[in-house]
């Protein structure tokens, strides 16, 4: 696979359980080949993750630019936190590490920020004015804040103290539901409380729900109550991080 016939990048999404990638047409957001997924190595050290990035580059015979997302606060190419990956990523020059491993130019962005940006350009928030929040419900809760089409990076709304003396992603993430065997009714109630909290803080105009659990959005979105904004599933489903 090469990028010679169209404007494209290799999109790679690094997650706690899987690292997936696909070449993406940057004008349409469409995949140019079937996505490829590799299990995240354990421990997910910089060296181990770098080897997977190189494996994806080789799989697609890629020679161009890479856009890579990461489950951490990313600032000026540095990862300032480490969610669901090895702690050695904290304060690491992650963009340089991964670019060196790939042997290609690479741009690094927080995973939820990248998903939100993809929804702004190609998906559910395309043309949306005002404040849009995207949350990704997975191993944790990622977030993106878009104001009049502009991304405000590294919001980390999953780490808000909620409901009491804890953080939101320990209360209503996809992993919490799965690990506890929580029924949809209880999960919906917890998510509803969290969204009401975000409503008080930010008064968003639109809420987009992504992450793996968004595949079953009909189980919980219609039951949400008391919100002054629309809640919609991500158009790009669980591939938004790649796009």
Regions found by a protein language model. Name each.
Residues 70:
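Glycine-rich nucleotide/cofactor/substrate-binding loop typically near the N-terminus or early
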Residues 106-111:
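General beta-strand structural signal in soluble alpha/beta enzymes
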